[in-house]
Amino acid sequence: MADEAPAAPPAEGEAPAAPAEGEAPPPAEGEAPPAEPVKNTYTLFYFNVKALAEPLRYLFAYGGIEYEDVRVTRDEWPALKPTMPMGQMPVLEVNGKRVHQSISMARFLAKTVGLCGATPWEDLQVDIVVDTINDFRLKIAVVSYEPEDEIKEKKLVTLNNEVIPFYLEKLEQTVKDNDGHLALNKLTWADVYFAGILDYMNYMVKRDILEQYPALRGVVDSVNALEPIKAWIEKRPQTEV
């Protein structure tokens, strides 16, 4: 094809041609060009464990987002605690502003890396699953952290015989109904959240809770096999939980 001649400049007093579709207009005379978008800075504060922060680390890894992974020691925590929004962790600092609530932080990161739904209705489907997983985790935690041995033994019977099977059977069926995922028939942050929090739940009950739930195991294995998350797992600090 022959080369096209360059467009003639506008005549004196004539308005310049409009920019092509999708093209940013040039700055007006004497006006500075638009600034480059500011890159967000992220810092995650938590103890040197996976637990509640690991889903957040998974989401950072999935999105290839750089962040500072601050692992606070027990000795450092008393001095740091008053500086946190609610005196607890995990806490996420974004551009110098600190926020708490691990589920809300995970949802924020999921939106950032494109793992949410395409509509409010789809987001609701994902949120329902994540909140159900969190309810499940809390029921395990209540028993795991019970200080009285005799009471704990009684609670463990109900937990193992009723609570754990109830939640896992429901979630197992959810995966079967969603083409191997926990929502929307595709990878969402519900899958990533579950894979990230599983080690903590296993730690609290001292066993692999997915032994009899192959569909859920498939979700976790698929997430952990994603290249950026696999790379994170290989390099992360080795901790008991």
Curated annotation (Swiss-Prot):
Catalyses which reaction(s): RX + glutathione = an S-substituted glutathione + a halide anion + H(+)
Region annotation (Disordered) ranges: 1-35
Every GST N-terminal domain range: 40-117
Domain of life: Eukaryota
Protein name: Glutathione S-transferase
Biological process according to GO: glutathione metabolic process
Ranges of residues in domain GST C-terminal: 119-241
Spans traversing the lipid bilayer: none
InterPro entries from the UniProt entry: Glutathione-S-Trfase_C-like, Glutathione-S-Trfase_C_sf, Glutathione_S-Trfase, Glutathione_S-Trfase_N, GST_C, GST_superfamily, Thioredoxin-like_sf
